[in-house]
Amino acid sequence: MTKIKIVAVGSLSPKFKSLDEEYAKQVGHFCSLSLSELKEFSEEKNIEVKKEKETKLILDALMPNSKVILLSLKGKQIDSIAFSKLIEMNTNQSFTFIIGGSDGVCEEHFESAQKLSFSQMTFPHQLFRIMLIEQIYRAFMILNNSKYHK
């Protein structure tokens, strides 16, 4: 069975958490899904120090031997069909999707990771978490020829 772990800096507010849980339940029919919410060092004034601290937590949370996908503005943009093919090509393997903090991550620690971007636009952090899990759900719907994706 495919294993997917979402590693995200920060936590969801209750209004986003219920939607996240709804998608997670649906995704759970197709894969083993887990989430690691990591501490955001919002009190840290030095952005580089903040990114280093958060990046260390991310690195510690990675699943061993998993395909690491960093969500980054510098990443490649793909559509939902291509995203579903990415998951299909790695069926029965492990993925770790990384959502860094509001200031990003120290990308030099993720040179071997695949980098994806959803857009050049900026999204609220909590909304992006929902967008990611929805795209994971959509990918499985595409792979199962569901009418969900039109």
Swiss-Prot record:
**Record note on quaternary structure:** Homodimer.
Do you know which SUPFAM superfamilies this protein is assigned to? alpha/beta knot (SSF75217)
Please give the GO cellular component terms listed in this UniProt entry: cytoplasm
- The name under which this protein is listed is Ribosomal RNA large subunit methyltransferase H
What lineage does UniProt assign to this protein's organism?
Bacteria, Bacillati, Mycoplasmatota, Mycoplasmoidales, Metamycoplasmataceae
Compartmental location: Cytoplasm
EC code = 2.1.1.177
Indicate whether rRNA-binding appears among the record's keywords.
Answer: no
What gene makes this protein? Answer: rlmH
Q: Where does S-adenosyl-L-methionine bind?
A: 71, 100, 118-123
Annotated GO MF terms: rRNA (pseudouridine-N3-)-methyltransferase activity
Arranged from A to Z, the UniProt key words for this protein are: Cytoplasm, Methyltransferase, rRNA processing, S-adenosyl-L-methionine, Transferase
Chief location of this protein within or outside the cell? cytoplasm
Spell out the reaction equation it catalyses. Answer: pseudouridine(1915) in 23S rRNA + S-adenosyl-L-methionine = N(3)-methylpseudouridine(1915) in 23S rRNA + S-adenosyl-L-homocysteine + H(+)
Please give the family membership noted in the entry: Belongs to the RNA methyltransferase RlmH family.
- Name the source's superkingdom: Bacteria
Q: What is this protein for, i.e. what is its function?
A: Specifically methylates the pseudouridine at position 1915 (m3Psi1915) in 23S rRNA.
Q: What class of enzyme is it?
A: transferase
Q: Which InterPro entries match?
A: Alpha/beta_knot_MTases, RlmH-like, tRNA_m1G_MTases_N
